[in-house]
């Protein structure tokens, strides 16, 4: 897989460059469409046989690299792809920080093949690996992580998303004394930062997109962290209303057809088999993980984080275009 590291970095770079000029335009679907087109073109220039096993688009009716789509020149290694052309299209549309173009590669049949739906996610760094169990209440997990890290609960730092669906979790954590950092969007960046050396967070708990979950799992595994995840249907994420039930029923049918289970806890090894993983994230707007795209006197500057699981390397790549 390491031979694909440079092509992968170029793919996320091209998607970010396509989206960036529209920062602040207010139209997240336009931004997604530009990134998807650029990403597809870049993927089709790579000498490999790629297959999108999980991708974003269906939840919010955005453009997409569709699940099952074959990309690449048709020769070379067979590769599973998990993709989110822009994680945080709303943030780009509103001119806000922490938007990324992200993608992960792994050998064929290595990544969880699932619909684009909601996923509950729990991530810790290597020092707390083995201390999480998503089938337990969040409060139990927070206590177990604090114990594994040798920290009192009031020193534990949990990152999540500032979404109504997570308000109960935020309340649970704060009642324990845990310090909660609620981001507007961006759980891929939060997952990586949780596993980062000198990490700002000890644990990540979110309910977000399944594509971002599988992409995050690739980075978490490459960084030696731990993660568990659970697919949940639209009613469980958004509320049990009449208009949501049809979507939830369709999601459950798609899961059955793909051979995955709703409300089953998946371990990190079930999300990502093996360690031959590549993860790439290019900043669109500035954030904690990587810098956003910047206009300079000599051109446009991008910054990309490239993580290799086989050799557990992390590279920050600054490019001038």
From Swiss-Prot:
SUPFAM superfamilies: Carbohydrate phosphatase. Its cofactor is Mn(2+). InterPro entries: FBPase_class-2/SBPase. Mn(2+) 1 binds at residues 32, 56. CDD domains: FBPase_glpX. Optimum pH is 7.5-8. Signal peptide: none annotated. Manganese. Mg(2+), Co(2+), Ni(2+), Ca(2+), Cu(2+) and Zn(2+) cannot support activity. Substrate binds at residues 87-89, 118, 163-165, 185-187, 209. GO terms for biological process: fructose 1,6-bisphosphate metabolic process; gluconeogenesis; glycerol metabolic process. Its EC number is 3.1.3.11. Mn(2+) 2 binds at residues 84, 87, 212. It comes from the Bacteria. The keyword Hydrolase applies. The keyword Phosphoprotein does not apply. Keywords: Carbohydrate metabolism, Hydrolase, Manganese, Metal-binding. It catalyses: beta-D-fructose 1,6-bisphosphate + H2O = beta-D-fructose 6-phosphate + phosphate. Competitively inhibited by low concentrations of phosphate (IC50 of 1.2 mM) and is also sensitive to Li(+) (IC50 of 15.8 mM). Also inhibited by 1 mM ATP or 50 mM KCl (60% and 20% residual activity, respectively). Slightly activated (40-50%) by the addition of 1 mM dithiothreitol in vitro. Belongs to the FBPase class 2 family. PANTHER family: FRUCTOSE-1,6-BISPHOSPHATASE 1 CLASS 2-RELATED (PTHR30447:SF0), FRUCTOSE-1,6-BISPHOSPHATASE CLASS 2 (PTHR30447). NCBIfam families: glpX. E.coli K12 also possesses a FBPase class 1 (Fbp), which is the primary FBPase in E.coli and probably represents the main gluconeogenic FBPase. Homodimer. Catalyzes the hydrolysis of fructose 1,6-bisphosphate to fructose 6-phosphate. Also displays a low activity toward glucose 1,6-bisphosphate, and no activity against ribulose 1,5-bisphosphate, fructose 2,6-bisphosphate, or fructose 1-phosphate. This is Fructose-1,6-bisphosphatase 2 class 2.
